[in-house]
Design a protein with these regions (language model features):
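Substrate-agnostic recognition of the 12-TM MFS/MFS-like secondary transporter fold
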Residues: 11-64, 102-160, 198-207, 216, ...
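C-terminal transmembrane helical hairpin of 12-TM major facilitator-type secondary transporters
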Residues: 283-322
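Intracellular loop-helix junctions on the cytosolic face of multi-pass helical membrane proteins
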Residues: 1-12, 16, 43, 47, ...
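C-terminal ends and interior cores of transmembrane alpha-helices
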Residues: 82-100, 290-304
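A membrane-interface helix-boundary motif in multi-pass transporters
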Residues: 72-76, 155-174, 255, 279-284, ...
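Alpha-helix initiation and capping sites
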Residues: 268, 428, 432-437, 469-473, ...
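Structural detector for internal amphipathic alpha-helices that build alpha-solenoid repeat scaffolds
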Residues: 457-467, 475-478, 486-497, 504-508, ...
């Protein structure tokens, strides 16, 4: 092992520790945050603090973006981890004197620092490892992060049983201190990362306003966040009614987060890739709103803690596994000049906007009905889930059109080995066929007409005798893809028709004039091309 490989191995080890600790701290922190807030305030105050947290988070993201334009992540993020660790100590000290204020401060603290630190950590990882080796290492780090989610839930539950909530705050501070040290030990980037000063938030909004596909992506993220806000309120409303003291709430939330962490990890590991390969991006994304709609109806009919646990658990499990992995693939068709400035806006700003809308809707419902029934909130979640399903249908169509257009124009390149979903595989095959068809037609026309003359009807009807096998196949492909009924029929009747041109016969099944003839010829080849027909 050379020195560079040894250094990378050490960096990876620290990254694995940091990822596990970071997500464990986040999950344990969420359990503590929820328990502390609900033990000091009625659940009807939850939308207010969520709105404040969303606004604070957006402000934090904008500030961090500005700082990262002048300070590298490896220098800035450890400092932010250290600051967060100190804030937990401050909240530990304040809790005995002002528990209400402390619970609000903790909520805002986690909202601002949570997204910033996770995003900053992945920026460090992306810069630290070279692109060639990054894919495999990132997969290992992501697995460590998933494991951290499970550990965090278990720790929150077990720690709450042996000590009070105040001591848990010191425990959370210690975890972020470990993150500060391990993240700093990951090391500096292996390559210089240029900062594009032309990329600004204003340009991102301009790009989104001019691209319908991006608008549908943003709309889906907003609706998913609204669903999450409604489902989370319904879940916590029932939980606060069943558990009265903060220690019981921490233990309950810790067990809940640990369970969804385990189930989400298993689902993504065992079925995530298979579902994408079998059903494509659209169907995979649709699983989340469909689950909310079904479980929401059950929750409306039977409003109990267990139905709300099922509803919230389904939402969390599918959001953190299938939805996230499939939604990330929606960026595939976008050229870099559109992807870079808009991804943060869609991923973060749209999510926070959804929090604001969802919490605003809850405040409106609470104004109308102060003793808001949980069933009403679940009904609203079902309605939003139905809207999300409609957006998924539109977005899937947009993805297909955008990817096909980008591939044909050559503005994006996709390595076939990197494709994990059925939708992209199908579009790549169609676009490759399109490019190959255009290339063949141009070559055939150039060979047949060196002086630029065009075919006449008499030329087309003439029998063409070519002894070269490749030339015969090329002419058959040219005829099959010409759009001319006479030439297509001539190709379908050619005795040289075989599996080598089957790919070009399949699209004819959608041609009303040629369906029967194409089907008749393909049935003789079907046993030899099962993969192309599925």
């Amino acid at each position: 092992m050379n020195n560079s490989s040894r250094t990378d191995a050490i960096a990876l080890a620290f990254a694995l520790i940091a990822a596990t600790t970071m997500i464990a701290q986040q999950v344990a922190g969420k359990a503590t945050r929820d328990a502390l807030f609900l033990s000091n305030f009625d659940v009807t105050n939850l939308p207010k603090v969520v709105i404040a947290a969303a606004i604070a988070s957006i402000a934090g993201v904008l500030l961090m973006s500005r700082l990262l334009s002048v300070i590298s992540p490896i220098k800035l993020i450890p400092v932010v981890f250290g600051l967060s660790s100190l804030l937990y100590i401050g909240e530990w000290f304040l809790l005995d004197y002002r528990p209400g204020i402390t619970s609000i401060a903790l909520y805002l603290h986690m909202a601002v620092f949570g997204a910033i630190l996770i995003s900053g950590f992945w920026s460090i990882i992306n810069e630290r490892f070279d692109p060639h080796s990054a894919k495999q290492r990132v997969a290992r780090i992501a697995a460590a992060a998933a494991l951290g989610g499970v550990i965090g839930g278990v720790l929150a539950s077990e720690v709450a049983k042996s000590m009070d909530v105040r001591a848990v705050l010191l425990f959370l501070s210690g975890l972020h201190f470990i993150c500060m040290v391990t993240v700093r030990c990951i090391g500096a980037p292996t390559r210089t990362i240029p900062i594009d000063n032309a990329v600004r938030t204003r340009s991102a909004f301009t790009v989104i306003s001019q691209t319908h596909y991006l608008q549908w992506m943003a709309a889906l993220m907003v609706l998913v966040a609204v669903m999450a806000a409604l489902v989370d309120y319904a879940f916590k409303s029932e939980a606060s009614a069943h558990f009265k003291d903060s220690e019981s709430l921490v233990a309950f939330f810790g067990s809940f987060y640990a369970s969804i962490g385990v189930l989400g990890f298993i689902l993504q590991s065992l079925l995530g890739r298979r579902i994408l390969q079998r059903y494509g991006i659209g169907m995979t994304i649709a699983i989340l709103p469909f689950t909310i709609a079904i479980f929401g109806v059950v929750g409306v009919a039977f409003t109990h803690l267990w139905t709300m646990v099922t509803l919230r658990g389904g939402q969390a499990i599918f959001t953190n596994s299938l939805f996230r992995s499939a939604f990330e693939l929606l960026y595939t068709p976008l050229p870099p000049h559109k992807k870079r400035p808009t991804k943060t806006i869609i991923d973060v700003a749209s999510d926070r906007l959804g929090d604001l809308i969802g919490s605003g809707l809850l405040l409106l419902l609470l104004f109308i009905a102060p003793n808001l029934p949980t069933a009403v909130v679940a009904t609203c979640a079902v309605v939003v889930a139905s809207l999300a399903l409609y957006v998924v249908v539109r977005l899937n169509r947009g993805y297909i059109n955008q990817l096909a257009r980008s591939l044909r124009k050559g503005v994006v390149r996709i390595d076939e080995d990197d494709i994990v979903d059925a939708t992209t595989q199908e579009i790549l095959a169609e676009s490759s066929a399109y490019s190959e068809r255009e290339f063949l037609q141009s070559k055939i026309e150039a060979l047949a007409h060196p002086d630029g003359e065009e075919d006449t009807d008499e030329d087309i009807d003439q029998d063409i005798s070519i002894t070269d096998e490749a030339g015969r196949v090329a002419l058959i492909i040219s005829d099959l893809t010409s759009g001319d009924t006479r030439r297509i029929r001539r190709a379908l009747g050619n005795p040289d028709l075989d599996v080598s041109v089957a790919h070009y016969m399949i699209p004819l099944l959608s041609n009303n004039e040629m369906t029967l003839e194409a089907r008749s010829e393909l049935r003789w080849l079907v046993t030899r091309i099962p993969g192309q027909l599925t």
